[in-house]
Amino acid sequence: MISVVIPTYNEAAVIEETLRRACRALEASSEPFELIVVDDSSTDGTAELAESLAPQFPVRVLRRPGRLGLATAVVDGWKLACGDLLAVMDADLQHPPEVLGELVRALRAPGADVAVASRYMSGGGTSDWSLVRRFASKSATHLAASVLPWTLGNVSDPMSGMFAVRAATLDGVRLDPTGYKILLEVLAKARYRALVEVPYVFDRRGAGSSKLGGRQSFEYLVHLARLAGATGQLAAWVRYLAVGLSGATIDLVTLYLAAGRLGWPLLAAAPAAIELALVSNFFLNESLTFRSCHASEHEIGSRESEVGSRGLLSRFLHYEKACVLGALLNALVTVALTKSGIRLLTAAAAGVVAGGAWNFLFNIPNIWRVWGAPTPVSRSISKCSAS
């Protein structure tokens, strides 16, 4: 059975069409299904209208006092669900209900445990977003991937509000989300092995206005911090930053000795100092930051035999590849500023900051992926082509 939770707040203008289109999409699956509307005290009669539609559609309505938030609405709705597949979508028609059928088909295929509707894969997109909104969405997505690189991996749209999951993956899992991004909570805590993404185009709002504001943005940041702590990634981040500071020190000291004391040409001294720092960072991360990775995922099956020198060499080469652009930016900034008359160590410090900023803004998931994630579940991600 398929259970779809639809959180609502003042969606009376579109709720009937949403339910009708959702039913049409799910009827094509030839499986029993239910729709659960979770309403946070709408003032426009959304809950009453949804209840009046029960003779037409298999819908139940859960009324909650006050505005308690979208993510907790999903959790409360799932608690009432009878299905072995649990799904969620918005009521405002920005999530095309027809995509529900694609999510169900993806989960009924062998092996998939989570199916995410993605705006950011081939075949997906947004209908009429402004440049500012696109930038804000991409920035929030990238921030999540940087703060939770183990959790999100290669998921293209971890901020998606439309997805489906096997109920069994949530058995015994305590979902305690903050704000409105329930998918982050599910990806961090669900016991799933494989995730599949389905493309969709985020549509225009059918009616009403956006519920997103400053409070929701703050709750999103709090949620990220909580999940980072709960999954061990916050502690790993502290170790990673400490290692990075040690590498910056090695870079600056080596450059000062090589170029300032030994007279090496700057074009030779800067790359040598950066490479020495990278080597130090790799081995410190290997032994301190990501040590737990080698005792879990990396030892599943035949992986255990690779933890020796061959596995170490492979990780080192992947690390060098992941860091090459940040290292190049570091060297370019250092050389350019020094040639313009800025003192060597000041220029080198600016280079370190530039390279570090590049890695944080664009490269953290790639770097952390060198070691994988310390989890007993090996997760895979695949893409469904647009149909």
Language model features with spans:
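Hydrophobic helical membrane-anchoring modules
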Residues: 1, 150-153, 175-252, 285-318, ...
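Short, well-formed alpha-helical segments that are part of the catalytic scaffolds
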Residues: 11-26
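Donor nucleotide-sugar binding loop of glycosyltransferases
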Residues: 11-14, 42, 96
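Conserved donor nucleotide-binding strand/loop of the catalytic core
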Residues: 33-36, 47-80
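A conserved acidic beta->alpha catalytic loop
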Residues: 39-48, 93
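Acceptor/aglycone-binding surface of glycosyltransferases and processive sugar-polymer synthases
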Residues: 64-80, 85, 94-180, 205-210, ...
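Alpha-helical transmembrane segments of multi-pass integral membrane proteins
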Residues: 71, 141, 184, 243-247, ...
